[in-house]
Each structure stands twice: as C-alpha cells, then as structure tokens.
Amino acid sequence: MKVLLLTGLGALFFAYYWDDNFDPASLHGARVLLTGVSAGIGEELAYHYARLGSHLVLTAHTEALLQQVVGNCRKLGAPKVFYIAADMASPEVPERVVQFALDKLGGLDYLVLNHLGAAPAGTRVRSSQSTRWLMQMNFLSYVQLTSSALPSLTDSKGSLVVVSSLLGRVPTSFSSPYSAAKFALDSFFSSLRRELDVQEVNVAITMCVLGLRDRASAAEGVRGITRVRAAPGPKAALAVIRGGATRASGVFYPWRFHLLCLLRSWMPHSRAWFVRQELNITTPAAA
C-alpha cells in the first residue's frame, strides 16, 4: 500500500513540476544578485543566468575563483557582470554587498541566496564559537541580505530565491548545528512570506530544498557518513532558476525530497527509515 501511495504521489509531483509555465525570456535583462558562486550549484546558477541574458552581480569568498566565473559569464553572453569578493561570516559585509549591487544595477529583480558555510559531519558536540560562525554564515547573513535588499525588491515586485537543504526540513544524524541554521532559514522565510502577503507586498519567496551539493567541500564534509550522491549542479541550478522565475513557493530537487518532507508528518516511521538508509551507520561519530 505504501509503495502504491508513493508511486501515485510521485506521478502527481512529476506532472506538477513538468508544467511550471517557465518563460526563459522573462529573465532577459533581469537584475540579479547571486551569492556563493565560486563552485557547484552557485557557479552553474551564474552560467544559466548569463545564458539567459540577465544582468549580474556575483559574490563569493575567494576572489580568484570569482574572477574565473565572471569571465565565463561574459563569454556566455551576460550583458553586465560585476563582482565583489565577500566573506559572509563578517556581520558588516552583507549590507555592503547589497549596496554594491544597487549601485551597479540601479535596483534588483532577484536576490538569490546560495552561499553556505559547511561543517564536518559526524560531530556530536561543537564549540559555541563554531556554532555562532555557522549561524552567521547560513542564517544571519541571509537575514541581513534580505533586509537590505527588500526595499528594492518591493519596488520592482521582485523575487527572493533561497537555496536551502533537506536538512532544513527533515532532521537527521550528525548535523545538528548546520541543520539548526537551515531550519531557522525555513522558519524565517516562511514567516516573512506571510508578513508580505498580509501587507500586500508583491515580493515572491521561493524556498529551494536541495540534496548534497555538487562541490568538493560539501562532499568532503560528509565523507564516510552518508551514501547520498551529490545532485548534478547544472540540473539542480536550472530547477532553482525555474522556481524563482515562476514565483513558486518551493522547489525540491531531486523531486523525491518533497515526498520525504511530507512523510515527516504523514508517516514518521517511514521517514525515519528513509533517512536511515542514507546514512553509513557503521561509521562512529567523532567525539
């Protein structure tokens, strides 16, 4: 019965995501501030936006990698590409990044929040200092960027696109500080969506629930802990862009993650079984 139910739900979700009315032309000339572009999905997001003719402000921590991505975006046809190297772990940086984007582009149509600070998996207890760093990188900087960009997005009736993780919806083992930051993201932006709706502010918020990032740092952080394979960067990035352009409230990639999130409430025992299958439980957690 469970298999039939999951199969039926899967077919419905596939049909839903297949017909999303995505119009690539809608992104031509769009003003986009994109964070975390030095590798993985962030880099692929930059390349997709460049091909679609968007005006870009790109940011990442490592300037040398950032410059390479900027050069590639120009080759792919982006009309305007600016960049600013920034460490989102510094509380004063997010506001400066948004102001730079506003100065260069004259406003924003999309704020795409993709940067992350990863922590090694398998650690039961982390120091308060490292946990504060994780919260600044993965939550507080998102709030700061949003707060600074919201007036411009309100003027343009734009969109907030938040790239998050399954760990912000479904708790799992060996990820407590990182998962806490991602749960905070989901709660903050879900509440903000309601506030904007009540105030009749036409700014869309798209929460993107992705799996393991297709980048070396993400894979290294969970080495020996999980059996999950990294999501292909180009495909995951396109799913994020489609969701943002169509003002969808949520994007799940791979799509089965939507089922897993539903199982959390509907079938908690089944959810726990699915999560357990993704773990290499023979690996002891670090002290």
UniProtKB/Swiss-Prot annotation:
PROSITE patterns: ADH_SHORT. Pfam families: adh_short. It is found in: Secreted. NADP(+) binds at residues 36-62, 87-88, 114-116, 178-182, 211-217. Substrate binds at residue 165. Its EC number is 1.1.1.-. Its main location: secreted. Glycans are attached at residue 280. The active site is at 178 (proton acceptor). Residues 1-15 form the signal peptide. Disulfide bonds: none annotated. One of its GO terms (cellular component) is intracellular membrane-bounded organelle. GO terms for molecular function: oxidoreductase activity. Keywords: Glycoprotein, NADP, Oxidoreductase, Secreted, Signal. It catalyses: cortisone + NADPH + H(+) = cortisol + NADP(+). Unidirectional NADP(+)-dependent cortisol dehydrogenase (in vitro). Belongs to the short-chain dehydrogenases/reductases (SDR) family. This is Hydroxysteroid 11-beta-dehydrogenase 1-like protein.
